[in-house]
Regions:
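Extended, low-hydrophobicity, Ser/Thr/Pro/Gly-biased non-transmembrane segments
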Residues: 91-101, 106, 118, 142-240
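Amphipathic alpha-helical substructures
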Residues: 371, 416-487
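N-terminal, polar/Ser/Thr-rich
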Residues: 16-49
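Zinc-dependent metallopeptidase catalytic helix centered on the HExxH motif
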Residues: 315-387
Length: 487
């Protein structure tokens, strides 16, 4: 997710303003999971009713007696222990007043038969299907009936100003690692999501005239007053949608990739479409070919700068012109770092956020016609980080580590400076240490070797060590553990 990282941060921090940021393991399961979701959107009540079919093949070397699903929309209900936004952001998230939503599961079956299931987890945000005997390699067919109450909020999951965002909206399988299912709740800082890749076929029936953006190849079927939009995607880490009867869509070709830009009102739509297409082409050259046939960029009411999903990104309609351009580029970089190459976003957010943020600098370096002084950009980022750590040292207790869980950052400001800003500085430092040729060779190897998988920090470090012939573990550790000196 993109939180605006601005050169003006230095000035803002100096004024004492709060930062404008948002607040190899068992995860490498073979691609054996598939989802089929048939959903109906009722725009009069802002509810979604859905039937979800999941085929899961046990890829682990252990018998499973249960399966866990995350129910992320549960965080938006009244009384949730983990609210989706920080207290200081509530008025910005809910301009019309706090409006609750959520998810209700009404039925679960296994193999077409009734089964044992319950709602659990630390915040009643997990679906547990129990009483199973699933040996390694065994297949499990599950069906889940659920209803969404979409809240009026400027967020990943919510609606505002005629646009509906459905991000992290359906029951999604948790990751099984270290002998247990991951049950991380919906933290308000960062992107508290972690999932393996799967194949998706998702249809959304909505009133005719509503335009739907989503993950994957798109097809539509009109039946009088309703239109069903169907998306298919293979080997993706998540699936998201956005819908509105006010969307305009423009398209461009980026080396064989169809780039779409959806917006309600944007006088510079063609410019932003071009930035998106240029980003796809630039990162394909730097890292390796874009992994999917299409990409949709959606300008939407959103509390933060942007949010990444496979083949679909949200960018906030409240950003300034320069920030909107940066958000588009940053979120598209996530198609390489998060969508294709996964990592644990809850414990190692610096891996994808740091690379995505540094990719913005690389984009401007490779596209000088955009008029951004890259040298000054890096210097300003360094200065803003040093100033932040000096001014907030009492609050953060001197902890400048980057390997904290999302819940261990004292605020989204702390999180952003240590995953985005310091993360970008880390990769700039690696580049200067190993040289351009080996730096980009390592990233290409990383992308090639870990697309469709979940990479651990040591996997990333090994790519740089192998390409450079240098021992870099201690170098990375000093940055990640917070012992490196930055001045």
């Amino acid at each position: 997710m993109k939180k605006p990282v601005l050169f003006v941060l230095i000035i803002m921090l100096a004024l004492g303003a709060l930062c404008v940021f948002a607040g190899g393991c068992d995860g490498n399961a073979a691609k054996t999971t598939s989802y089929k979701i048939d959903a109906v959107l009722d725009t009069s009540t802002m509810t979604v009713t859905a039937e979800e079919s999941v085929t899961f093949v046990n890829p682990y070397e252990t018998e499973l007696d249960c399966v866990y699903f995350h129910l992320y929309p549960a965080a938006f209900r009244e009384g949730a222990r983990y609210a989706p936004v920080e207290d200081r952001k509530i008025s910005e998230a809910y301009p019309q007043g706090v409006d609750y939503g959520g998810i209700a599961v009404s039925n679960v079956t296994v193999g077409g038969e009734a089964c044992a299931w319950e709602i659990g987890g630390e915040d009643e945000d997990m679906l547990l299907v129990t009483g199973l005997t699933l040996m390694p390699g065994d297949a499990l067919d599950m069906a889940i009936s659920f209803t969404l109450d979409v809240p009026q909020i400027r967020h990943r999951f919510g609606y505002y100003d005629g646009i509906i965002n459905l991000g992290n909206w359906y029951p999604v399988l948790s990751v099984y690692e270290d002998g247990a299912w991951r049950t991380d709740p919906y933290y308000s800082s960062g992107d508290p999501f972690y999932s393996d890749t799967a194949d998706y076929t998702v249809s959304l029936k909505a009133p005719t005239g509503w335009n739907v953006a989503g993950t994957g190849k798109i097809s539509t079927s009109v039946d009088g007053e309703t239109t069903t939009t169907t998306f298919t995607a293979e080997g993706v880490r998540d699936f998201a949608l956005s819908a509105s009867d006010k969307f305009t869509c423009v398209e461009a070709d980026a080396g064989g990739v169809t780039v779409r830009y959806y917006y309600k009102a944007d006088a510079n739509a063609e410019k932003h479409l071009k930035a998106g297409a240029d980003a796809v082409k630039t990162f394909s050259e730097l890292y390796g070919a874009y992994a999917y046939p299409s990409l949709s960029v959606v300008l939407t009411p959103f509390l933060y700068g942007g949010m990444e999903y496979p083949q679909l990104v949200y960018v906030s309609d409240s950003l300034s012109e320069s920030l909107l351009e940066e958000a588009i580029i940053h979120e598209i970089a996530h198609q390489w770092w998060y969508a294709a190459v996964g990592n644990d976003q809850i414990t190692d957010a610096w891996m994808d956020e740091g690379l995505a943020e540094y990719s913005v600098t690389l984009f401007y370096e490779k596209n000088p016609d955009y008029g951004v002084d890259v040298t000054n950009r890096i210097a300003d980022v360094m200065q803003s980080y040093v100033l932040f750590t000096e001014m907030y040292s009492e609050l953060i207790g001197g902890d400048t580590s980057m390997n904290r869980k999302l819940c261990d950052y004292f605020s989204s400001t702390d999180y952003s400076f240590h995953t985005y800003v310091k993360g970008a500085l880390l990769f700039d430092s690696v580049r200067h240490s190993v040289g351009d040729a080996k730096f980009f060779a390592a990233l290409k190897t990383y992308y090639k070797n870990y697309t469709g998988k979940v990479a651990a920090p040591d996997d990333l470090i090994a790519c740089f060590e192998n390409e450079s012939g240098m021992k870099l573990k201690a170098f990375f550790d000093s940055w990640v553990n917070g012992t490196v000196g930055l001045y």
